[in-house]
């Protein structure tokens, strides 16, 4: 009787091990299948690169208010803190579109990538001096470091701001691409001057940073939304892009009707700023994407 019991117990244990093994194999197969499915869906989706800046606000609203979803197209935002990270993905084809600036697009085109620019955004850039360094004017930037991004609006604007200005020494343009890191360097007294757009520019003003130059002073409109020409010409992408534009324009209408303050929570979520910053933001108007 005892031997029979041991035999039954051993058999039950072996069956349990066998079932566990099968279960593990099944789980591995299912995980692999799910991963491959996710990859296929991601490749098929329209992927748009965005930054934690207010020129991307219509995209954030279209995402969180389900305007993209309502179109029936799979439209996905890919958030990054750096223009260069978006550019790399755009050039490599893992993004179909992105919010960027005209100078970056010119650089990308020189790399041999076809680009279709569909809109100019309301982005502007302001140059701030470190209040700890007591920098109040552009002419004080001699022998100082200015944080910017190479071959971008901020690189171009550095030259514009310094044109005809006599400084006591060379101005050192240093590359810091992460917009959040750039702001932290100001707050931590690690950079003499730097370019910021909204809402980081408002955060800098609240910190007491001195604005040295505003891109709007020269009438520049450098913000842009663009798609890869290859994606633009692709028949399978046409509906997705049309749906993206429709959702974007709906978000623009809502912002212009109600003001950006209505979307404070969304701004905080995507841009990482606090309620004080949201309340101090300037009034901004947005334009439709109008493709000719």
Task: Tell where the protein language model's regions lie, with residue ranges.
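Sec-dependent signal peptide recognition
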Residues: 3-10
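Secondary-structure end/capping motifs
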Residues: 234-292
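Sec-exported extracytoplasmic/periplasmic mature domains
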Residues: 64, 91, 110, 163-167, ...
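C-terminal motif of bacterial Sec signal peptides marking the signal peptidase cleavage site
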Residues: 16-19
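Periplasmic-binding protein-like
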Residues: 121-131, 206-237, 241-245, 283-288
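Short, glycine-/small- and polar/acidic-enriched structural segments
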Residues: 23-176, 185, 192-198, 211-219
């Amino acid at each position: 009787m005892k031997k029979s019991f041991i035999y039954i117990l051993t058999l039950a244990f072996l069956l349990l091990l066998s079932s566990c093994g099968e279960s593990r194999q099944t789980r591995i197969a299912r995980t692999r299948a799910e991963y491959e499915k996710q990859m296929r869906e991601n490749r098929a989706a329209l992927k748009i690169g965005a930054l934690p800046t207010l020129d991307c606000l219509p995209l954030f609203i279209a995402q969180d208010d389900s305007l993209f979803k309502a179109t029936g197209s799979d439209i996905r935002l890919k958030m990054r803190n750096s223009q260069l990270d978006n550019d790399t993905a755009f050039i490599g084809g893992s993004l179909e579109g992105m919010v960027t600036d005209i100078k970056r697009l010119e650089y990308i085109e020189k790399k041999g990538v076809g680009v279709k620019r569909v809109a100019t955004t309301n982005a502007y850039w302001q140059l701030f001096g470190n209040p700890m360094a007591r920098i109040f004017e552009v002419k004080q930037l001699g022998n100082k470091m200015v944080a910017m991004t190479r071959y971008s609006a901020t690189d171009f604007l550095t030259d514009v701001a310094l044109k005809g200005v006599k400084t006591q020494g060379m101005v050192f343009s240093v590359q810091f691409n992460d917009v959040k890191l750039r702001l932290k360097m100001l707050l931590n007294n690690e950079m003499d001057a730097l370019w910021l757009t909204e809402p980081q520019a408002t955060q800098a003003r609240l910190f007491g940073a001195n604005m040295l130059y505003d891109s709007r002073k020269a009438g520049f409109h450098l913000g842009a939304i663009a798609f890869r020409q290859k994606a633009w010409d692709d028949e399978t992408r046409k509906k997705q892009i049309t749906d993206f534009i429709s959702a974007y324009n709906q978000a623009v209408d809502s912002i212009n009707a109600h003001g950006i303050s209505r979307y404070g929570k969304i701004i905080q979520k995507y841009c990482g700023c606090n309620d004080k910053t949201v309340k101090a933001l300037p009034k901004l108007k947005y334009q439709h994407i109008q493709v000719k």
